[in-house]
UniProtKB/Swiss-Prot annotation:
Presence of keyword Glycosyltransferase: no
EC numbers on record: 5.1.3.13
Keywords assigned: Carbohydrate metabolism, Isomerase, Lipopolysaccharide biosynthesis
Outcome when changing K73A: Reduces the epimerase activity by over 100-fold
Name of the molecule in the record: dTDP-4-dehydrorhamnose 3,5-epimerase
Pfam families from the UniProt entry: dTDP_sugar_isom
InterPro entries per UniProt: RmlC-like, RmlC-like_jellyroll, RmlC_Cupin_sf
GO cellular component, one term: cytosol
Native organism: Salmonella typhimurium (strain LT2 / SGSC1412 / ATCC 700720)
Annotated family: Belongs to the dTDP-4-dehydrorhamnose 3,5-epimerase family.
């Protein structure tokens, strides 16, 4: 069983599982195809699962894939805590350029559904975090795109006071208006 929590962008959903716990530990169903499709209102096929580990203050993103290789992602944090962000990059969307952010952690067990047409990123809040995501399309290097994490046109309110640790690629990412020129 999952509880759906709507966000400021209607297509991006927080999924909170029913957790059964006692002195031995806990159990929850992290994914059920039928339940998931009922919750989001359409059929989805996940073709790739990814797992990353990041230390505190590492920021990954904002990443997306273009065109027919666009990816929907169902993400969660299995160890530690992250602040996870989705940015609407669908040019015809009424929420284009808007973002939503949510804390995902091993403790709250929440997941975030990010449909195709969004850029995605996260920053690690705990000493380290292990992050899991299911993707609806295969990774395609020729279709990948990125947006600079601190683009003022988007205005993400990241929850940190010092500059994050970035890959060279993420640090050199273009602003939103430049990133979408090749669409």
């Amino acid at each position: 069983m999952m509880i759906v929590i709507k966000t400021a962008i209607p297509d991006v959903l927080i999924l909170e599982p029913k957790v059964f716990g006692d002195e031995r530990g806990f159990f929850f169903e992290s994914y059920n195809q039928q339940t998931f499709e009922e919750l989001i209102g359409r059929k989805v096929t996940f073709v790739q699962d990814n797992h990353s580990k990041s230390k505190k203050n590492v920021l990954r993103g904002l990443h997306f894939q273009r065109g027919e290789n666009a990816q929907g992602k169902l993400v969660r944090c299995a160890v530690g805590e992250v602040f996870d962000v989705a940015v609407d990059i669908r040019k015809e969307s009424p929420t284009f350029g808007q973002w939503v952010g949510v804390n995902l952690s091993a403790e709250n067990k929440r997941q975030l559904w990010i449909p195709e047409g969004f850029a995605h990123g996260f920053v690690t809040l705990s000493e380290y975090a292990e992050f899991l995501y299911k993707a609806t399309n295969y990774y395609s290097p020729s279709s990948e795109g990125s947006i600079l994490w601190n683009d003022e046109a988007i205005g993400i309110e990241w929850p940190f006071s010092q500059l994050p640790e970035l890959s060279a690629k993420d640090a050199a990412a273009p602003l939103l208006d430049q990133a979408l020129l090749t669409e």
